[in-house]
C-alpha cells in the first residue's frame, strides 16, 4: 500500500515533539530549548517496519477499574503520554473522565479526576469532562485538552489541576487564560519552550497558548474548509490532533478532510498527505492521532479503518505491516497491515516502538519490532457482554414492537452495478419517513467526527456502542435542529442562505434513553450497527421489547457448481423418453464442487414479501436410507453471522454471484449462499466440497439453515445425489 505524497514532504523536521510523545527528566537542566527526548541517537527510525501488537492494559470491557493491567478497564482511552520513568499516562473519557497511569509493572492507577465536571483541585478532587489529548512540557507538567469543558487544563507533578485557558463555555475568543474560549478542543501539543498548541476542533482552528496564558489564533477561518494558505486563509475541517517539531513546524490531523497539514513558522499551511483521488478504500481515513520521531517520521492513527500509518520525511506513507498476520491469499481476509478498532492517541517509546490507545476496543496496545525467537502473543478477542434487560426500540413507541426489515450478514450491492459490494452490518427497523429516531442506550459521543453523510441516504451518527443510520442527524423533517446539542451550520451566501448545510455532534455530547437523535429519511427505516470491543456484532443479541421469531427459514433451492462455475443439472428427458431417476449425478472426477443454497428467513410481523438473511448455515451428508455418513454425525456449520469480517470484500467469499437485492438493481432479493465457504468468528474463507473423497453411491445432501432463534428450515433441505 505505497502512497506517494506529491504535495509536500516533511524534510527538515528535526527533533520532534508530539502531543503524546514528550519525555521529561529531573536530571536535565531546564533551560529554554533544552528538551529531553529519550530516543537514543543510534536508534534511527526504520521505514515501514513490521509491527507486533501486544496488549498493555484493558480487558476489553468498558469501565473504570484500576489494578493489574490484564484485569483493568478503560472506557474511552484517548490521549497517551510517556514520562522518563516508564509510566504511561492516559486520558480516559466516556463515563470515566480521569487521567490514568500504567506503571512499568503494569499496574493501572488514577492520577487525577473522578466524576464528570469542571473543577480544579488535587488528584481525584479535580474534575474533567471528556479529556482527550495530553502532553508533557519539559518541566514535567501534563497538559490536557478538556474537550467537554472547552478548556485546556494543566496538571503539576504533584497532581494539582488548574485551568490554563478557557472558562467552560463554548466560543472562539482570543484572550488571556479564562478570558479565552474554545469549542471542544481535542488535539494538543507542547513545544520545547513551553508553548501549548491546540487543535480547536469545532472552531476548525489552530490556537497558541503562550507561557503567560495568552491565547491567539494561528490558522483557520470561521468555518470548516479545505484550503492551504496563510493564517485565516487556510481551511481545516475538525482538526483533532497536532504535533510540533523543535523548529516550530506544526503537523495537524485534519480529520474531516482525511489529510495531514503542515504549518510553517510564518503561518503558511500546506497539505502533506491525503488519499489519492479515486482511491477505493484509502488507509488515510479520519486521522485522529499523531506522533513525531526525533528524525522526522510522523505516525498517524487512522481512526476509520484502524490503521497506524508512517509518513516518511520524503513524503511517502504506508500502513505498518502486522508482523504476525500475513495478507490473506484470497483477498477476503486481512490485508497484512496492523488493524486496530479505533486508534486515537499515539506515543513513541525510547526504542522506537509505539503505545496506542484503542478507544473502541477499550484497550492500550504496544506496537514493537519482533525480536528473534520471540513467539507472537495471543490476540485478545472482542468481549461479548450479554444484555439481559429488555431494550427499547430506536423509534417510537419505544416499548412497542416494530418490524425488522434487515438483519446482519445480508448481501448488499453498490449503485455502480456490483451486487456483492459489502455486508449489511446491522439491524433495520422500519419507520415512517420523518419519524424520530430515539436513543436506546444512555451514551456519550466518543469519535471527534461522529456523524457523516449530511442530507444523503446513508447519513448517520456514531453514539456509544451503536451507529444510527438513514436519518437526518439532529434535524426534523424541515431541517430544523432538534435541540442545542446539535451544532447546525447554515449557508451564509447566495440563494441558499440560511439553509442548513451541515450538522455537528461534538465529542463529549451526552444523550439519554429516548432522546431524539434525528428523523427517518427516505430509506424509511433506521439501521443499527452494534459494536462490542470495537467489533461489529449481531444486534439481534439485544433483547428488544416484545421481539419474537417463530418463523423458520425457507430454502428455495440447492445447487452444485463445478470449478468453472457451471451448474450441475439432473438428467433431462423428453416426452418420448422420460427420465425416471431425476437425482443429481455428480462425477467424482470433478474433485471440488461448490454448494449454493438459495434461502431466506422471516420474523414475526414481517410482510409476506420481506426477505431476511440467515444466522447459521451448514450441511450434512446422509446415505440414501437416512443414516449418517461417517464424519457427518452432526451438520458441518460453515457460516455463523455473529460477527462480520473487517474486509468488505469477504462478502464475495460467502455469497454466490447470483445474490443481490432490489435496492441495488437486482430483479429480486436473493440470498444465494456459498455454503461450503466459511464465515466464523468474523473471518471468511472460500471453500469447496471434495466429492472425490466420497465412495460412489447414493446420498442425501442435507442443508442446515437456521435463524437467530434456533429454528431450522425443514422443507427443501434435502438434495438427492448419486456420486459416480
Where are these regions (language model features)?
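Residue-level detector of Asp-centered blade-edge/turn motifs that repeat once per structural unit
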Residues: 82-85, 136-139, 190-193, 244-247, ...
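Surface-exposed, glycine-biased beta-strand/turn segments
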Residues: 373-467, 472-479, 505-516, 520-526, ...
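Gly/Pro-rich loop segments of beta-rich domains
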Residues: 42-76, 107-132, 160-184, 214-240, ...
Amino acid at each position: 500500500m505505497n502512497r506517494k505524497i506529491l504535495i509536500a514532504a516533511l524534510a527538515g523536521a528535526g527533533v520532534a515533539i508530539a502531543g503524546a510523545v514528550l519525555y521529561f527528566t529531573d536530571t536535565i537542566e531546564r533551560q529554554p530549548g533544552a528538551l529531553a527526548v529519550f530516543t537514543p541517537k543510534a536508534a534511527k527510525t526504520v521505514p515501514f517496519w513490521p509491527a507486533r501488537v501486544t496488549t498493555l492494559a484493558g480487558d476489553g470491557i468498558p469501565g473504570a477499574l484500576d489494578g493489574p493491567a490484564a484485569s483493568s478497564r478503560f472506557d474511552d482511552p484517548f490521549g497517551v503520554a510517556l514520562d522518563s520513568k516508564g509510566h504511561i499516562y492516559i486520558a480516559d473519557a466516556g463515563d470515566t473522565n480521569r487521567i490514568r497511569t500504567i506503571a512499568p509493572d503494569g499496574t493501572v492507577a488514577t492520577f487525577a479526576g473522578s466524576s464528570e465536571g469542571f473543577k480544579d483541585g488535587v488528584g481525584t478532587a479535580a474534575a474533567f469532562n471528556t479529556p482527550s489529548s495530553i502532553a508533557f512540557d519539559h518541566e514535567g507538567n501534563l497538559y490536557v485538552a478538556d474537550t467537554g469543558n472547552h478548556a485546556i487544563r494543566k496538571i503539576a507533578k504533584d497532581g494539582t489541576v488548574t485551568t490554563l485557558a478557557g472558562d467552560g463555555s463554548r466560543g472562539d475568543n482570543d484572550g488571556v487564560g479564562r478570558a479565552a474560549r474554545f469549542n471542544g478542543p481535542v488535539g494538543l501539543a507542547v513545544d520545547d519552550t513551553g508553548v501549548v498548541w491546540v487543535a480547536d476542533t469545532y472552531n476548525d482552528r489552530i490556537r497558541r497558548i503562550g507561557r503567560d496564558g495568552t491565547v491567539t489564533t494561528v490558522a483557520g477561518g470561521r468555518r470548516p474548509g479545505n484550503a492551504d494558505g496563510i493564517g485565516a486563509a487556510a481551511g481545516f475541517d475538525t482538526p483533532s490532533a497536532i504535533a510540533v517539531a523543535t523548529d516550530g513546524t506544526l503537523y495537524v490531523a485534519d480529520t474531516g478532510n482525511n489529510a495531514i497539514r503542515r504549518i510553517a513558522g510564518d503561518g503558511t499551511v500546506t497539505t502533506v498527505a491525503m488519499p489519492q483521488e479515486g482511491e477505493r478504500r484509502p488507509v488515510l481515513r479520519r486521522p485522529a492521532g499523531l506522533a513525531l520521531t526525533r528524525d522526522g517520521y510522523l505516525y498517524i492513527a487512522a481512526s476509520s479503518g484502524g490503521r497506524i500509518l508512517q509518513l516518511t520525511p520524503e513524503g511517502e506513507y504506508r500502513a505498518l505491516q502486522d508482523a504476525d498476520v500475513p495478507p490473506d491469499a484470497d483477498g477476503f481476509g486481512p490485508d497484512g497491515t496492523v488493524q486496530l478498532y479505533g486508534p486515537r492517541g499515539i506515543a513513541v517509546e525510547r526504542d522506537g516502538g509505539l503505545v496506542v490507545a484503542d478507544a473502541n476496543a477499550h484497550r492500550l496496545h504496544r506496537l514493537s519490532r519482533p525480536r528473534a525467537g520471540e513467539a507472537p502473543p495471543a490476540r485478545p478477542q472482542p468481549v461479548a457482554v450479554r444484555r439481559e434487560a429488555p431494550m427499547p426500540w430506536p423509534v417510537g413507541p419505544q416499548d412497542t414492537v416494530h418490524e425488522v426489515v434487515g438483519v446482519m450478514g445480508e448481501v448488499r450491492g453498490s449503485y455502480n452495478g456490483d451486487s456483492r459490494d459489502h455486508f449489511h452490518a446491522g439491524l433495520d427497523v422500519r419507520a415512517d419517513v420523518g419519524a424520530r429516531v430515539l436513543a436506546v442506550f444512555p451514551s456519550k459521543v466518543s469519535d471527534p467526527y461522529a456523524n457523516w453523510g449530511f442530507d444523503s441516504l446513508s447519513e448517520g451518527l456514531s453514539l456509544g456502542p451503536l451507529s444510527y443510520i438513514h436519518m437526518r442527524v439532529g434535524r426534523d423533517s424541515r431541517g430544523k435542529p432538534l435541540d442545542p446539542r446539535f451544532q447546525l451550520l447554515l449557508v451564509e451566501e447566495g440563494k441558499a442562505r440560511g439553509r442548513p448545510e451541515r450538522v455537528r455532534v461534538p465529542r463529549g455530547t451526552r444523550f439519554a434513553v429516548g432522546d431524539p437523535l434525528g428523523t427517518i429519511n427516505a430509506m424509511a427505516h433506521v439501521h443499527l450497527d452494534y459494536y462490542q470491543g470495537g467489533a461489529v456484532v449481531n444486534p439481534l443479541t439485544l433483547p428488544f421489547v416484545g421481539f419474537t421469531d417463530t418463523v423458520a427459514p425457507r430454502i428455495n433451492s440447492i445447487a452444485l457448481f463445478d470449478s468453472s462455475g457451471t451448474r450441475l443439472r439432473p438428467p433431462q428427458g423428453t416426452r418420448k423418453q422420460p427420465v425416471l431417476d431425476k437425482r443429481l449425478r455428480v462425477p467424482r472426477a470433478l474433485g471440488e464442487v461448490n454448494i449454493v443454497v438459495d434461502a431466506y428467513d422471516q420474523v414475526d410481523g414481517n410482510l409476506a414479501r420481506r426477505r431476511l438473511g440467515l444466522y447459521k448455515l451448514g450441511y450434512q451428508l446422509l446415505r440414501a436410507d437416512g443414516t449418517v455418513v461417517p464424519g457427518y454425525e452432526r451438520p458441518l456449520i460453515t457460516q455463523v453471522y455473529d460477527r462480520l469480517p473487517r474486509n468488505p470484500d469477504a462478502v464475495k467469499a460467502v455469497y454466490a454471484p447470483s445474490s443481490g437485492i432490489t435496492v441495488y438493481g437486482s430483479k429480486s432479493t436473493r440470498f444465494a449462499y456459498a455454503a461450503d465457504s466459511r464465515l466464523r468468528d468474523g473471518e471468511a474463507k472460500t471453500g469447496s466440497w471434495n466429492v472425490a473423497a466420497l465412495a460412489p453411491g447414493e446420498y442425501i445432501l442435507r442443508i442446515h439453515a437456521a435463524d437467530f432463534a434456533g429454528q431450522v428450515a425443514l422443507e427443501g433441505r434435502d438434495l438427492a445425489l448419486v456420486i459416480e
